Amino acid sequence: MSLQGQIALVTGASRGIGRGIATELGKQGVIVVGTATTQKGADAISEYMNASDIKGCGLALNVLDATQIEQTLSVIKSKYGEVSILINNAGITRDNLLVRMSEEEWDDVLATNLKSVFRLSRAVLRPMMKARQGRIINISSVIGSTGNPGQANYAASKAGLIGFSKSLAREIGSRNITVNCIAPGFIETDMTEAMSAEQREKLLRDVPLQRLGQVSDIAAAVVFLAGVSAAYITGATLHVNGGLHME
């Protein structure tokens, strides 16, 4: 599937990994629609796309709202056409030890990180099946494979994405639609930039490559899985973590 002229929907695209993915896809000639939870965030997406000469726009979307999802896809269809690449990147954390974790903290994370992926994927499937091509790429996490104290909800949601992707890949492979996961490790972000040297050293102790990942590392993996070179890859999880977790 050539990337030129394809239409991508990238959730959680106002900053960080989502912004990097949207930008890199745009550089490859993809029409990109990035979403944010607020109009301010959506406007910021449109601004950086315009500044980088990327065709597309930002839209406000609450990924928990099924009606908004349908409305957003309708807007995209009227402006650009049907979505052919879906990047499920939006996610949240609500960290707490399980003994103290509230039902709300559990439900919020599972709804945003997993149920929204079910809804968005289901919503784009019929047009992809009709076109007999498509890419669905779900952004999981190394935590989904390793677990982490205080993140049982987050780990469950990210592990769930891996099982979801494998199952969906088996369902729709005959329609030439691939479904894959990318599982980032520790990525350089505003939060990691604020770490002390001691905290950073501790973080990198178990990373063989001895550095944090860059947003560009994740974006490059997305471009690969979205493109023609990955046409025979489906149901896979690509771990981009500097060797922190190996399979």
Set out the residue ranges of the language-model regions:
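Residue(s) in the substrate-gating loop at a strand-loop-helix junction
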Residues: 141
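Substrate-binding pocket helix/loop in short-chain dehydrogenase/reductase
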Residues: 97-98, 102-110, 192, 203
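Short, small/polar-rich loop/turn modules that mediate ligand/substrate recognition or access, typified
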Residues: 173, 178, 233-235, 241
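Conserved glycine-rich Rossmann-like NAD(P)H-binding loop of the short-chain dehydrogenase/reductase
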Residues: 28-44
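Conserved glycine-rich cofactor-binding loop
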Residues: 7, 14-16
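Alpha-helical segment proximal to the catalytic Tyr-Lys
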Residues: 126, 170-174, 231
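Active-site helix of classical SDR
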Residues: 121, 157, 165
